[in-house]
Amino acid sequence: MNNITEYIINRRSVRTYDGRELDKNDIEKLTTYAQTIENPFKIPVGFKLMNAKEYGLNCPVVVGTDLYVGGKIKWSENASVAFGYSFEMFVLYAQSMGIGTVWLGGTMNRSAYEEAMELDGDEIMPCASALGYPAKKMSLRESMMRKGVKADERLPFEELFFDGSFDKPLSKENAGIWLDALEMVRLAPSAVNKQPWRVVVTDNAVHFYLKRSKGFARTEKLDMQMIDMGIALCHFDLTAKENNLNIVFEQNDPKLESDAEYIASFSLV
């Protein structure tokens, strides 16, 4: 996938579609690409395209399409963040084709989606997405939802990224080779637009942390803010590599003083 920054910048959640069925060639491309998706945690994610009428699926915030994609993954310690990375790769590929998506976690009849995904005993379906061609105009409901979560707003660069430690905010001017990749992290979507990622840049590495939002519900097997972290890691990794940065993924906690939760790092080779 080339021009990754273009797709990240231009993508938005789409809840209002134009009613056309996806072209068969587009469906085939999506299905084929989904089979190639990998994440740095080496945990496979299975994708399935599903027709709402066939499987009895319902999502009250989506209009104009009957097609959805679900993802499933075997539950493990890193399952949520791995899922977020892989599912965002699918979302960005759909964007590259002009196909709209919207992350769905709670506003759906989850049991029907899970049944359609044919989960095994240790598998979970963290999220799904609608798929379709975006309508030219949003519905009133969609406009109100976006306004309610301030969907087009993002936190300032200096509140998300830090220079060496959490005591020193990182400016764009000092971000150096990491600037583009960090900016694509800043633009990433997140549940209710909470933007829970915090990133510390050291000499030759970038360390990702989760700063949990107060009152944000989670269960043992479903952690939406960990999924958000996977999205952030995906944006960083794809952008850095498109900029020809030779980086490796690792989970090696640098033990920085913080109340945030360490997730993973990327280091220059």
Can you say where each PLM-predicted feature lies in the sequence?
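Acidic, surface-exposed loops and disordered segments
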Residues: 1-269
